[in-house]
């Protein structure tokens, strides 16, 4: 007859049997559950909600989400070398392009806005930045981040102003010198794109203009109070310009109030120029008219041609009243639309991958 285990020995055997059984069950459960989820890439970062509107075709959706949903006043992304290419005629200079993965400058460098805000939206572009250091710096510091700033290609030293504007969250545009009405009496400078110039010369001038600064989301055909009316009226040249800008991942703001939306590129036309004439009373009246248009139509986009002290002061005071009137001030990029000819279709990309 086999020997019986004593009660202490039997208890010890039961204890270890229970332990081994529990360990086995735990191993099986962990195997079924798999590895724990990875932590977010940015410590403490919350998931970003989907954009209220679809990203333009050809844009990287993740880049669009980062840019458009980062929120008002968040710093603009620093220039990314992957979104540039060498300027053939200007050694050391670079041109914008669509980067790897389809990331476009117009999304990466777009100013922040709240996609959940359903109030009527109002945008304002302030031009002439970079020509006067004092006036430009005052505009950067004194105006809300949602005001979009258009830099002149003729700015002597734009780098410090660009850095300050990005840090404050201002979306940046580049002003294009296009042949205006009454040229040459009205002259947009030595690199103006002209209706009578050979195509190769206009291409060289555009290359020079686009290479003056980096990190801009779009362009505008306004420069120092001139709005490029004659160039824009010449269909062939204007179409080629839009296509070149679109292939570089930019958007275009047409400064001619009431003009149709750009036909070849994401963009929008200005609804109202608010500083013509540049008097305090006229500016205040124009800004109020712009707000009324936004309330009536759901959105509106204004342009102030130059950062005069009176203009900056009036815009700053007016912007502080918009929330009480149920309006949201947003960057220009939040108001652009896709051209009908390309809406829902992939963009042709020649300046990129």
Q: Model segments located where?
A:
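Solvent-exposed loop/turn segments at secondary-structure junctions
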Residues: 129-131, 154-157, 178-182, 224-229, ...
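Active-site beta->alpha N-cap acidic-glycine motif
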Residues: 103-187
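Membrane interfacial helix-start segments of signal peptides and signal-anchor transmembrane helices
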Residues: 2-30
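Catalytic domains of cell-wall/extracellular-matrix polysaccharide-remodeling enzymes
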Residues: 200-281, 306-316, 322
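Juxtamembrane proline-rich low-complexity "stalk" or linker regions positioned immediately after a signal peptide
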Residues: 29-100, 107
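Glycine-rich anion/phosphate-binding loops
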Residues: 154-158, 195-205
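Extracytoplasmic/luminal low-complexity segments enriched in Pro/Gly and acidic/polar residues
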Residues: 264, 272-353
């Amino acid at each position: 007859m086999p020997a019986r285990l004593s009660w202490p020995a039997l208890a010890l055997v039961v204890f270890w049997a229970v332990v081994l059984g529990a360990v086995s069950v735990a191993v099986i459960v962990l195997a079924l559950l798999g590895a724990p989820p990875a932590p977010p890439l940015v410590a403490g970062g919350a998931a970003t909600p989907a954009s209220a509107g679809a990203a333009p075709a050809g844009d990287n959706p993740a880049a669009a989400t980062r840019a458009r949903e980062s929120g008002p006043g968040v710093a603009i992304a620093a220039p990314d070398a992957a979104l540039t290419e060498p300027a053939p005629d200007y050694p050391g200079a670079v041109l914008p392009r669509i980067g790897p993965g389809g990331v476009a400058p117009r999304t990466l460098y777009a100013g922040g806005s709240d996609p959940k805000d359903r109030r009527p939206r109002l945008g304002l572009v302030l031009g002439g930045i970079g020509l006067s250091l004092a006036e430009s710096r005052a505009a950067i510091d004194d105006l809300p981040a949602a005001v979009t700033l258009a830099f002149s290609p003729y700015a002597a030293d734009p780098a410090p102003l660009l850095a300050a504007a990005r840090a404050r969250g201002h979306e940046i545009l580049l002003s294009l010198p296009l042949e205006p009405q009454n040229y040459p009496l009205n002259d947009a400078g030595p690199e103006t794109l002209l209706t009578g110039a050979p195509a190769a010369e206009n291409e060289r001038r555009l290359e020079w203009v686009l290479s003056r600064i980096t990190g801009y989301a779009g362009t505008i055909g306004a420069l120092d109070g001139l709005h490029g009316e004659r160039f824009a009226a010449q269909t062939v040249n204007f179409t080629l310009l839009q296509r070149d800008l679109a292939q570089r991942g930019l958007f275009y703001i047409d400064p001619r109030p009431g003009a149709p939306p750009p036909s070849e590129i994401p963009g929008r036309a200005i609804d109202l120029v608010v500083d013509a004439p540049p008097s305090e009373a006229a500016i205040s009246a124009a800004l109020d008219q712009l707000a009324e248009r936004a309330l009536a139509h759901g959105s509106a986009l204004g342009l102030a041609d130059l950062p005069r002290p009176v203009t900056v002061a009036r815009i700053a005071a007016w912007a502080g009243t918009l929330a009480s009137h149920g309006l949201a001030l947003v960057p220009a990029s939040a108001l652009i639309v896709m051209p009908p000819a390309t809406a829902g279709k992939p963009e042709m990309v020649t300046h990129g991958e």
